[in-house]
Amino acid sequence: MAGQKRHYLITGAAGLVGPALAERLLEDPDNIVFLTDLIKPSIPPGAKHPENVRLLEADLCDQSAMEKVVAAALPLTAAFVFHGIMSGASEANPALAMKVNVDGVRSMLLHLAKVQRGVRVIFSSSNAVYGAPLPEVVTEATTPTPTGVYGCCKYMMEILVNDLNRRGELDAYSVRFPTIVVRPGKPSPAASAFLSGVIREPMNGIECPLPLTDRQFKATLCSPRVAIENLVRITNWPSDKLPPHQRAINFPGIIASVQDLLDALAKVGGEDKLALVKDEPNAAYEAILRSWAWSLDYSKPLELGLIGDENAEGLVREYVATLKK
């Protein structure tokens, strides 16, 4: 006898994380996955049960459209609120960022609480909530002081998630992603996009511009595989895993410099690939990048059962393996 069907809604599903998460969820024939974005998403090519995918094209900033998407997916096992304007585009257009990343997300969270009180929600936040003045090492106990529009929007929604969870309106967690490397596909309008591009583009015979010349610039990174595994784990966490009014958790990442990535590229892909990496300084992007925290202590999320990658070389090898499929 077939099991009871579980419904999962993923917004921002035309990006990287949404399709990868959907593919993982679709390993189970009892999972029905609803994918929605401004542009109609595609069925993940590796989906084991593609018949269980529902594709919904919608502008979630339109209240009526958003409500129709939610209604189609009810009753929900979990909703993954992943839609938003990325860091570089947010800084270039703060009004749009506020409309999408704050107003649109807020409306959806409140509507989910209204139509299915206590539903599990996973909100995608970011390490960009941290900004100057930064301590030597950042933990969940560090007070976020975002110095960019993107981080500001994410932190505002984290606070709303905290309060909705505290009041029992949602059963929610906010996950602060490190930079996911290597992202497949085309470059995104994120300031950190080059951290994937520096591997992805040369491995595909394309030049990659670097927005800063400092090869020792460090960032916190994780692979798509680890990000998806941690999403699945946190989706199944009990409600009391974190205090009711403190629902944000940092997803584990590794600390790697630009040089670490270049060294891994040369080792895995060949020294000739380095010639495709070009310095093209971008002061606006560099300012955003240098405002973010990179030295984070991940002992708490690891103790709670999340996982991390080993090193930069592992990130590159994982991506190269996908090119051979």
Where are these predicted regions, by residue range?
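Amphipathic terminal alpha-helices
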Residues: R6, D279-P281, A293-L302, I307-K325
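N-terminal Rossmann NAD(P)H-binding glycine-rich loop of SDR-like oxidoreductase domains
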Residues: H7-D28
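NAD(P)H-binding glycine-rich loop region in Rossmannoid oxidoreductase-like domains
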Residues: L60-V100
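Glycine-rich NAD(P)-binding loop of the Rossmann-fold in SDR/ketoreductase-type enzymes
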Residues: C61, A92, L96-S107, P144, ...
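Conserved Rossmann-fold NAD(P)-dependent oxidoreductase catalytic core, especially the SDR/UDP-sugar
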Residues: A79-V81, R106-G148
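Active-site Tyr-X1-5-Lys
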Residues: A132-L134, T145-Y173
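NAD(P)-dependent short-chain dehydrogenase/reductase
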Residues: N162-K218, P224-E229
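Mid/C-terminal beta-alpha module of Rossmann-like enzyme folds, strongest
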Residues: P202, N230-Y285, L289
